[in-house]
Amino acid sequence: PTNCPGIPRNLVVTVNPIPAVTNAILSQDICAGTTSSPVVLTSNVAGTTFSWTATGNAGLSGYQASGTGNIPAMQIFSNLTTQGAVRYTITPRGPSTPSCAGTPVIYTINVDPAPIVTNASMQQSICTGDKTTAVTLTSNIASTTFTWTANAVPASMTGYQASGTNTIPAQTIVNNSNVQGVITYHIIPSNSPSGCVGIPSDYVVYVNPKPVASVVQSVISLCSGTTTNIALLSNVAGTTFSWTASSPGSINGLGDGTGNVIAQTLINTSNAPHPVHY
């Protein structure tokens, strides 16, 4: 060999930094059915791009399964009775070729369940002046508390509690009108300790008026063999009537019955007037 020197060449090796996700907070809590806050992703390397995939508990829905860049706001639903979670696995990549990938980081959205009222029956009926049955409210979540307000139609009804928490107590309610009264208890369930508010429900108490029977004339005089024509009236529309009939004398043709008109042919078999009592 001649040991002749060659022509030098310069070789430049660029060593790109490995990016990292630098968000200080990597989780948030929301209530089922509400919208999460968008997540602006940050890195220690300018120009870093992000890709992410999401996995959630069975029973959660509404979240985006994958994406790039920031994590957008999402309305997430849950049919769970305990807290669920959506976990976003975020991979940062540097801006220059070969786009070095950093260590994946997990961002978690915890989804607290929203309670619902689960009572099988949501109504009852009483007559005015009677006492309601107390209503023990139930939910799909054991720690649920309830607040409720009552609205009465007509507003003249008395005896009901205007608002309260948890059990709706037994109450003696008076409806002095001639129409059916309705008291609607608007119930809002909330989950303790998360405070998540569920879908409101209504419990209804129907308060029926007590009808009063009346006739145009309370005392009528008839000749034997004449048919009565006594129209029965009431202060409450739709009232039905039943009656019993009796007489201390010798009267034929009377009897118990039902309907809106008492039509009976009464025959006095004696020589003296006798009353018939309905």
Language model feature labels by segment:
Residues 1-278:
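Extracellular low-complexity Ser/Thr/Asn/Gly-rich intrinsically disordered segments
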